[in-house]
């Protein structure tokens, strides 16, 4: 008989209200997603506050903050140049928030926060779309503020043959419009896929294929299937930590490249 208590791989993405609040017809309840975004922002604030102390001999915390700030600063300098310095705080905040939000979803709390199981807020397209809108909105504001209608020159690459002048701007404009969608969907899909895979593998360990089985069958099952699956989960979990960092980096990198287009028109 098939097991009836299978793990639902999509349950982890369910947004649940922790504190109900309604204003008229609008539901503005404080949810688990909002909680973990607040925790991510608090973790970022604590991380930065710990690095503000300029000790003569920096400790590990201060060194970690300096490494991260230098990393983002080098990214901005390489991709935008000196004109990109004013946007370093924005790119740093996006990078660190996404990094913390991604990583917090992988932290096993084991009931330390009752009713607040780990939740990856970046696994919801509404969150990633908001982050993408912030990045893309900044690009538009910077582009039109600095260049006015000359910003549309971005859609006519230098050296475009006259024979293609009717075609290239349309392709470039379409590619430009797709940028926020690709930013949002890339992060959303990457975070969702990895977590679903971990839940599916966990189901093989928690639920044997036969609900009522002999001890001998269960021993053989966990030896041949359970242990290898558990080891595979450890490897995939380690890979997920790497994916969390890579996705935060890619989001920040693309934001800096898009800002470069808006600032330098190339």
From Swiss-Prot:
Report the membrane topology from the UniProt record. Answer: Multi-pass membrane protein
- What keywords are annotated for this sequence in UniProt? ATP synthesis, Cell inner membrane, Cell membrane, CF(0), Hydrogen ion transport, Ion transport, Membrane, Transmembrane, Transmembrane helix, Transport
The record's subcellular locations are: Cell inner membrane
- List the Pfam families hit by this protein, alphabetically: ATP-synt_A (PF00119)
Which positions, given as ranges, span the membrane? Answer: 28-48, 90-110, 125-145, 158-178, 187-207, 216-236, 239-259
Q: Which Gene3D superfamilies match?
A: ATP synthase, F0 complex, subunit A (1.20.120.220)
A GO cellular component annotation in the UniProt record: proton-transporting ATP synthase complex
Instruction: State the family named in the UniProt similarity comment for this chain.
Output: Belongs to the ATPase A chain family.
Quaternary structure annotation from Swiss-Prot or TrEMBL: F-type ATPases have 2 components, CF(1) - the catalytic core - and CF(0) - the membrane proton channel. CF(1) has five subunits: alpha(3), beta(3), gamma(1), delta(1), epsilon(1). CF(0) has three main subunits: a(1), b(2) and c(9-12). The alpha and beta chains form an alternating ring which encloses part of the gamma chain. CF(1) is attached to CF(0) by a central stalk formed by the gamma and epsilon chains, while a peripheral stalk is formed by the delta and b chains.
Q: Kindly give the NCBIfam families that the UniProt entry links to this protein.
A: ATP_synt_6_or_A, PRK05815.2-4
Task: Sum up the protein's function in the record's words.
Answer: Key component of the proton channel; it plays a direct role in the translocation of protons across the membrane.
Name by which UniProt lists this protein: ATP synthase subunit a
Species of origin: Zymomonas mobilis subsp. mobilis (strain ATCC 31821 / ZM4 / CP4)
């Amino acid at each position: 008989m098939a097991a009836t208590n299978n793990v639902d791989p999509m349950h982890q993405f369910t947004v649940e209200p922790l504190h109900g609040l309604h204003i008229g017809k609008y539901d503005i309840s404080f949810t688990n997603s909002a909680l973990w975004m607040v925790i991510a922002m608090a973790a970022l604030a604590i991380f930065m506050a710990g690095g503000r102390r300029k000790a003569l001999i920096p400790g590990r915390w201060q060194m970690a903050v300096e490494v991260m700030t230098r990393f983002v600063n080098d990214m901005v300098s390489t991709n935008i140049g000196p004109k990109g310095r004013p946007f370093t705080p924005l790119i740093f905040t996006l990078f660190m928030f996404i990094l913390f939000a991604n990583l917090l979803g992988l932290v096993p709390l084991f009931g330390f926060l009752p009713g607040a199981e780990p939740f990856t807020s970046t696994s919801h397209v509404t969150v990633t779309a908001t982050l993408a809108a912030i990045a893309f909105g900044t690009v538009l504001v910077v582009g039109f503020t600095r260049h006015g209608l000359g910003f549309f020159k971005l859609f006519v690459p230098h050296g475009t043959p006259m024979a293609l002048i009717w075609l290239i701007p349309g392709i470039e404009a379409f590619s430009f419009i797709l940028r926020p969608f690709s930013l949002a969907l890339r992060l959303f899909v990457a975070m969702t896929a990895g977590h679903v895979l971990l839940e599916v593998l966990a189901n093989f360990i928690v639920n044997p294929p036969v609900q009522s089985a002999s001890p001998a069958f269960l021993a053989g099952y966990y030896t041949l299937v359970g242990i290898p699956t558990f080891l595979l989960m450890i490897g995939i979990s380690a890979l997920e930590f790497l994916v969390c960092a890579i996705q935060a980096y890619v989001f920040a990198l693309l934001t800096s490249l898009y800002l470069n287009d808006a600032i330098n028109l190339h």
